[in-house]
A protein has these predicted regions:
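Active-site-proximal helix/loop segments of hydrolytic enzymes
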Residues: 1-178
Length: 178
């Protein structure tokens, strides 16, 4: 939060402590906030050997997710699909900056239909900052300096995303001659 405020962004946290909020409640907060982006930060748990940073954007309508074959439910339009290009641009900017700052194992930018990103009608991503199930990464995640570096890296990635959008909107459009 502080890293974003330093860069001039207004922030809204869906929670400040270990209070349980449903994914739907988190989505509702984002959807009623004008002109925002949504970044959900989690830590993974899998096997003790799993390590690395991965960032998820909503899979576009009609495409398979990173982990599954194409299913009939993939044809359903979701709120987050209104922002497909922005979702992947945000995921790429945040992921690249986070890898650079953290020197983590790169598990990639992936596509999924997780509840926390599928209902967001704003650009939104899910950042998995590492694996608590790994003794090496778990110890790293436990350190406040690591968590602050991750927060700063995410904020920097958001700044890079915004700069890219500003450049895109300032490029003059070619006129089409019929």
């Amino acid at each position: 939060e502080q890293a974003l405020k330093i860069l001039g962004y207004k922030t809204i946290l869906t929670r400040r402590s270990d209070v349980v909020l449903t994914l739907g409640e988190r989505v509702a907060i984002a959807n009623r906030t004008p002109r925002c982006i949504f970044v959900s930060v989690h830590y993974n748990s899998f096997s003790s050997s799993a390590m690395g940073l991965e960032t998820f954007a909503l899979a576009p309508q009609g495409t398979a997710t990173t982990y599954d074959e194409l299913k009939s439910s993939d044809m359903k339009k979701r709120g987050g699909n209104l922002r497909d290009s922005e979702n992947i641009a945000l995921a790429t900017a945040v992921h690249a900056n986070s890898l650079y700052k953290l020197r983590s194992v790169d598990r990639g930018v992936k596509r999924a239909r997780y509840s926390v990103i599928s209902g967001i009608e704003k650009p939104g991503i899910l950042v998995e900052g590492g694996f608590v199930s790994s003794s090496t990464e778990g110890a790293r995640i436990h350190r406040p300096e690591f968590r602050q570096t991750l927060a700063d890296a995410i904020a920097g990635g958001i700044g890079n995303y915004r700069k890219a959008l500003m450049k895109r909107s300032s490029v003059p459009q070619r006129s089409r001659i019929p």
